[in-house]
Amino acid sequence: MLTKLDLCSMALLKLGEKPLTSLNADSASAQLARTLYDITIEALLSGHPWRFATQALSIEKNQDNEFIVPENVLRVLRCSEQLLGNQIFSNADSVKMLAVVRIDAENFPSYFVSLAATKLAMEFCIPLTGNQQNLRTLISLYESEFQNAKFIDSTTDVNPGIAQFALIDARF
């Protein structure tokens, strides 16, 4: 199972640095990993409607008779009612939404793992190495991996097939 430590170590290896043995280590690379990992991965997940991180949600009113966007939602793609901030305004009993949600590294597909490691390497590059040329190289690699990851993600949809109903049954 892939962990935060694994992803951060992959990023450090892309920089030519030694991998981490622990995120709690007392080193500059471990401190960067602790500080930047969550925000970097959340920004990467919310920056595109990744299918592997997209969920259909049904939200019920809370005890105050309000709808609140769940904490694991990074980006709302569609909502059946009016959304303002993290509140949903509706007279209905439940609200449906399609959202990009926070997921653990162990659930990342391989094409996203490489992209995430490269993005983390970009974030770690200047604080650790101070090398602008390495950063430019990582940016170029990231842009290429991002396009590839979006393509793979967009072509992995499962075709539900043709729905069953009388006209289709009569034709086929």
Where do the model's predicted regions map?
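Internal mixed-charge
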Residues: 1, 6-7, 78-172
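Long, hydrophobic N-terminal alpha-helical segment
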Residues: 1-45
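Hydrophobic/aromatic-lined pockets within catalytic cores
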Residues: 12-16, 20, 41, 45, ...
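Solvent-exposed, flexible loop/coil residues
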Residues: 24, 56, 112, 116
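Sparse recognition of residues in long alpha-helices and their boundaries
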Residues: 27-28, 56, 136
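Short, well-structured hydrophobic secondary-structure segments
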Residues: 31-77
